[in-house]
Amino acid sequence: MSNISNCHNKIVLTGGAMVLAVTASVFAQEKPFMQAGTSQPPSLSPPQATEPAATGTNAVAAADANPLEKFLNGEVPDAIAHGKFNLNVRLRYEQVDEDNQTPYTKNSYAPTVRTRFGYTTAPLYGFQGMLEGVNISVLGPEHNYNAAGSNGQGARPPVGDPPMTRLDQAWLGYTSTNYVPFSAKVGQQQINLDNQRFIGDAGWRQNMQTFDAIGARVTPVKDLNLYYSYVWDVNRVYGDVDGLPAASPNRDFDSRSHLINVSYAACPYGRLVGYAYLLDLSNGAGNANSCATYGGYFAGAAPVNDKVMVDYRAEFAWQDQYADNPQRYSADYYNFELGANIKPIAIGTGYEVLGSGANSGAGGERVGFKTPLASLHPFNGWAEVFITHPNNGLQDIYEYAQVTLPEQIPVRFIYHKYYADSGSGNYGQEFDVMISKKFGKYWNVMVEFADYLGENVAAPALTAPKVNIQKFWAAVEFNF
């Protein structure tokens, strides 16, 4: 009943926000240059619903009707009738085995099915609306896995897919192409910026992360894109489900955050992007995730000849505490990646550093670079050992290779080696492999495996060094 109540409250709050701010929003993100070595496996994150094409006035509106009658009895019903339904169903099995990790004495086995169903109206004078709900059900006994700490299975390692039913999108949008292209959106929505390293919908999990926000995007001149959003609530993947402790760091965030992103794509060899993410976040665990991050990157690809394509990325950012965060620190981030695509093979290497800074505020010691609103699964290993970044920072050296087998079956291999950024700690290494196959227009099948081997220093999520974590996933997904 609590989930239903939470869903009802979100409908009321979101609906009010939509009425008060009907003229603003965030448009669907254009596809960015992705990091080939760390990008999320294809077709695993459900796509945002496509927007239906505009339609004419409903035939039932009489030709001589007054404008109000045409609007209410013709154009509004027409926009509803010519809208688009979307359906996504993902059946997934996840198994987690953590050796030498206290207090886990058993494995987790999580067979779940996620059903997402929504509807988007056709455009009406530039306006559109969307409603979408999600249900996550467990196929079998719920006590076979630790549902993110919400079901009392503390002897099993956590799997971030608790069962729930909730509203996950409810927004009103506006788009105009007159003079200066402009789009806006208000309400509960997906927001994916760039490669989702800082802001994303965490689409790997069965319940995606959404944002209660109002924002806009404008293109004042060709190839220059300006984006701003104000976020007042973050609906995280755990959904504040029953049983989740009140002080859990996994609960939804109350927010007073500003997202700013500026991109320029006139260069044929890539895109230049600058950003500022001012995150004022709090939940039952406190305000320690509040941070201000400023940075930018250049990423793109260039042909060497008609058979070889080189891709590259260079990014730098710095971060300080923000708003009510009691910590006082400053930390840097940088990422360099170089790859080559020689069909049907792609190879590459990268170096990502999430720095660390001395803390002169509450808690003392050091504070690591934070990414609390990121889509975390694609980065620093699929075993998700470093979802919580170490206080001493993290250096991730990775290599990847992908080969596309006959029948368009990509197989990806990634190797990670981890070190502390401050000090001489060795966090271990990880091997990842993934194979996927699309069947027709609507179906995708995926199998993924991650094997983490700890060394002399324990990662933040671990209770001891030399922990071995193995995770396995098998999924079938239908998108319509």
Segments predicted by a language model, with ranges:
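Extracellular/periplasmic loop regions
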Residues: 144-157, 311-410, 460
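Residue-level signature of outer-membrane beta-barrel architecture
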Residues: 77-78, 91, 119-125, 173-176, ...
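Repeated loop/turn-to-beta-strand initiation elements of outer-membrane beta-barrel proteins
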Residues: 85, 125-129, 179-184, 222-227, ...
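Residues that define the transmembrane beta-barrel architecture of outer-membrane proteins
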Residues: 81, 107-113, 163-168, 208-212, ...
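Transmembrane beta-strands of outer-membrane beta-barrel pores
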Residues: 91-97, 133-139, 188-192, 230-234, ...
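Surface-exposed loop and membrane-interface regions of Gram-negative outer-membrane beta-barrel proteins
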Residues: 93-113, 121-171, 176-180, 184, ...
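Outer-membrane beta-barrel "beta-signal"
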Residues: 33, 467-480
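N-terminal periplasmic/intermembrane-space "pro-region" immediately following the signal or transit peptide
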Residues: 2-108, 114-124, 343-346, 351
